Amino acid sequence: MAKQVFQTTFAGRELIVETGQVAKQANGSVVVRYGESTVLTAAVMSKKMATGDFFPLQVNYEEKMYAAGKFPGGFMKREGRPSTDATLTARLIDRPIRPMFAEGFRNEVQVINTVLSYDENASAPMAAMFGSSLALSISDIPFDGPIAGVQVGYVDGQIIINPSQEQAEQSLLELTVAGTKHAINMVESGAKELSEEIMLEALLKGHEAVKELIAFQEEIVAAVGKEKAEVELLHVDAELQAEIIAAYNSDLQKAVQVEEKLAREAATQVVKDQVTAVYEEKYADHEEFDRIMRDVAEILEQMEHAEVRRLITEDKVRPDGRKVDEIRPLDAVVDFLPRVHGSGLFTRGQTQALSVLTLAPMGETQIIDGLDLEYKKRFMHHYNFPQYSVGETGRYGAPGRREIGHGALGERALAQVLPSLEEFPYAIRLVAEVLESNGSSSQASICAGTLALMAGGVPIKAPVAGIAMGLISDGNNYTVLTDIQGLEDHFGDMDFKVAGTRDGITALQMDIKIQGITAEILTEALAQAKKARFEILDVIEATIPEVRPELAPTAPKIDTIKIDVDKIKIVIGKGGETIDKIIAETGVKIDIDEEGNVSIYSSDQDAINRAKEIIAGLVREAKVDEVYRAKVVRIEKFGAFVNLFDKTDALVHISEMAWTRTNRVEDLVEIGDEVDVKVIKIDEKGRIDASMKALLPRPPKPEHDEKGEKSERPHRPRHQKDHKPKKEFTETPKDSE
């Protein structure tokens, strides 16, 4: 295929697509240039159907550091495992693509996005999402696209599509919305307590922009798209299906309607084991035994799927007996753990999360070094999902994509209400341990996180609660579910998570298994979620009505002072000598950022106060007209040098020592004397002149002796010592220092 170039303008930036030049052995490949961001996307499909009961789709987003003109960090100086941001971007692309493959499609598909050049003002993740859809659409892979996604901001009351970096920093909204030309099928958002109305407007305007990108893709597909390959889809034997349904559907229906999760799972497993045993015996010697038993398992799964949906849509009854808008029983506990800096245990039905708070100095912030400029991350929310939470064994190790994604969602939800660094100079880490799970564990972790923050004395603006909404749709009719449990998530069409305060939404996340949902469904889901959110907030606020006024006794005490940026080097000293001396003397730890914020922390408040005193002295500046109790440290013929404070000295010229003339400095002061002085001048080089006589009363006019002549006896200041008269010295040096 010869190289072809397609070009348009989108959101104020040039969007160029190139095909037929690179990665030509992939099933489909494109180079997408958006602004000066360039992403290569290649899509490949395996030749045969994979084994297993799921669709093996893998989406990768690779950040090459050369794209931003940077070296990778670390000793190896080579890209390694994906960053958290890259992992989240890969998930963001995967989620709207996955529903666009046919039911029963089991061939392995890989979509690899490589960022080749990076423009911080032209979204590389959105270029990668566009490229992923387009590479699949022009290939022979049976993909029912295209889809597209955009980022949406909200600045000064205006919706902005694909905001620049500067606009994103000012935005009250960080939203990614994706979908087909007919409907939205993926949402990811953080927001600063925005209303449901603003969020809905942003979603719909985002979808309008998505339609523009899809129209551009359709133009390209019409020009260079390949004919789709014929692939085998997983399907079950119709006669076998009818036979099993007739014999066992009634038993399975009864099992599904058991309300308690573990009892229901046990009851359904009994039916499945019974059916499996019957057909293992019946077809033990059949040459297609494996295929038949695979069909049996798939048929049983489909029967359970159908019964859950029938209960909700026809009988308006959920598997656990709740109404469609009813929340499971709630419980909230604070101070579950001793010694830690804060803890909260939140339970919703059979979903339970423990959140643990840790506070630390700003030196513990996470340094993020990606394609953007390096920055420090102050707040971290980590989510752990051990297999025992669902009563199973399984993989145990580093967090996977799902755990990273759920942690990031909770982080976005809670970050919006955290105090500023000036209000609360701590690094903050929350760890959510899912102890039980029957759906919506990520939202339970948000509720538990709120409890831990409030119990730990972190002055959040308002409590945050989260709820997961579900959907059962047959194409014509639909039912929106509040607080979905695991079974409803597994067999339902939507998982729509909404978190926020009483004043507005702080985070959204939506994934669906159908090809899109309408504005009507979104509106209803947001309204039901708001009602549920308020119910949960009632429970949280009843447990802990307000943020604790003090930190936990085990939390580090931190105090901060602000110094001028040009004084940082004074506090640090040559090779860190000064700051190391302060730390050794006081036993504190000290962090100084590039803006001059000095954080001092210790378990001993007296040590913090002493360190603050030392640092304040180091950066203190003398000011004209200020008075100091100074110590004489050096004497010269022309005056005395006095130490005002720390390393700041001033010159008291001999003429500024007394109102009467004196010939010798030593007649008035000696080294080690303490005298009161007033700063009278600071020159452009920072040299300080001070005066003693400015603080002394001016003497009266000299009295006359009996002969009518003035007395030559000088007026002696109170601190002047008796000395024999010495030869007068009147020379004044050119440089007083």
UniProtKB/Swiss-Prot annotation:
Q: Which cysteines are joined by disulfide bonds?
A: none
Q: What GO terms in the biological process aspect are recorded for it?
A: mRNA catabolic process; RNA processing
Q: Which domain of life is it from?
A: Bacteria
Q: Can you say where in the cell this protein is located? A: Cytoplasm
Keyword Protein biosynthesis carried by entry: no
Q: What class of enzyme is it?
A: transferase
Instruction: Provide the cofactor list for this protein.
Output: Mg(2+)
Q: Any idea of its EC number? A: 2.7.7.8
| Catalysed reactions, as listed in the record | RNA(n+1) + phosphate = RNA(n) + a ribonucleoside 5'-diphosphate
Gene3D superfamilies, per database record: GHMP Kinase, N-terminal domain (3.30.230.70), K Homology domain, type 1 (3.30.1370.10), Nucleic acid-binding proteins (2.40.50.140)
| Residue ranges annotated for the S1 motif domain, each copy included | 625-693
Q: Which UniProt keywords apply?
A: Cytoplasm, Magnesium, Metal-binding, Nucleotidyltransferase, RNA-binding, Transferase
Which InterPro entries does UniProt cross-reference here? ExoRNase_PH_dom1 (IPR001247), ExoRNase_PH_dom2 (IPR015847), ExoRNase_PH_dom2_sf (IPR036345), KH_dom (IPR004087), KH_dom_type_1 (IPR004088), KH_dom_type_1_sf (IPR036612), NA-bd_OB-fold (IPR012340), PNPase (IPR012162)
Q: Which residue intervals define the domain KH in the entry?
A: 556-615
Q: Which PROSITE patterns match?
A: KH_TYPE_1, S1
Biased amino acid composition, Basic residues? 715-724
Which parts of this chain are annotated as the region Disordered?
Answer: 691-737
Record's GO cellular component terms: cytosol
What residue ranges carry the coiled-coil annotation? none
Q: State the function annotated in the UniProt record.
A: Involved in mRNA degradation. Catalyzes the phosphorolysis of single-stranded polyribonucleotides processively in the 3'- to 5'-direction.
In the record, the note on similarity to other proteins reads: Belongs to the polyribonucleotide nucleotidyltransferase family.
Q: Which HAMAP family match?
A: PNPase (MF_01595)
**Protein name per UniProt:** Polyribonucleotide nucleotidyltransferase
Q: Give the species this sequence originates from.
A: Streptococcus pneumoniae (strain JJA)
